[in-house]
Amino acid sequence: YDAILGINASGFADYEGNGTGGLPYGFLKSQGETLQPAVADGWKIIGFDEDDHLQIGEFTDTSNLRDGVEFHPALIINGQNLVAGSGLSDQQPRTAIGQAEDGTVMMLVVDGRQLHSFGISVERCGEIMESYGAYQASMLDGGSSSVMVYNGREITSPTTLSQNPEGRYLPDAFLVR
């Protein structure tokens, strides 16, 4: 894909219950082609339009999106922090994506379930994104899926590495070229 940076994106279907990932769950669109329709009631579609603006919401028409996935919860929409005071305070490995009004894209990945990092809460993710000026932001899949790769090398420590040295197969990702 010739990317310099990437983070995991949507959740995955785990029909056998073994947590290996690999099959996307929910809406998936890549380079203008819809690969899967939306499935989850109340989940948000998170994606970029042709002008690289991050869109987050429950859309029936996704024709304006170039790339997108489906997950929840939205953290910030139109500058409003939706998770402040929500009680979503359990600490886990987390991944989030956001965008400032000037177009700057933000990617947040926090390790968890490890001695060097217990994780972070959804509320804290919202606070961090807000503190960096996110106008739109959403959670992506977390837990053992949370990973950031820079120049082909993992720069975070996914919890799956303790269970499987090859890590978890991810169904999709947001990439920076």
Where are the regions a protein language model picked out?
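Gly/Ser/Thr/Pro-rich low-complexity, intrinsically disordered segments
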Residues: Y1-R177
